[in-house]
């Protein structure tokens, strides 16, 4: 069951591809230089920061940086490759090698980023874009967005409070 869920998760991780100008074909490895990964895709910055890896790694490899920051290398590689490389299809062995705590840390930090930064920024841009709209229309759109944001908060809170602790117990 766990591998089925992880398999689906990694197959659906295409959310960062819009941040890059082109698709990449060669998967990154533990020996790839982190600076090369960042230069090839700005989306990698979001991923590594959510794994707790700060900037300032010079010419170090992904493996070296993961070791220094206590991040599972195989999990980070799967996150990077699944998010950045077009049509990346991880093997069952790669999916089975995921370190659950590293993945859950990434997901928890992703929730925090989205709830604390992205949703408020989207709301602010939406309000700014509606500055010249009729007040009744602005009210309806703002209310719709706020209700949507609340549903997202509830969903992510449920995952943080219920799903992730349950997954840790498996």
Model-assigned labels for residue ranges:
Residues 2-170:
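Small-residue-biased structural context
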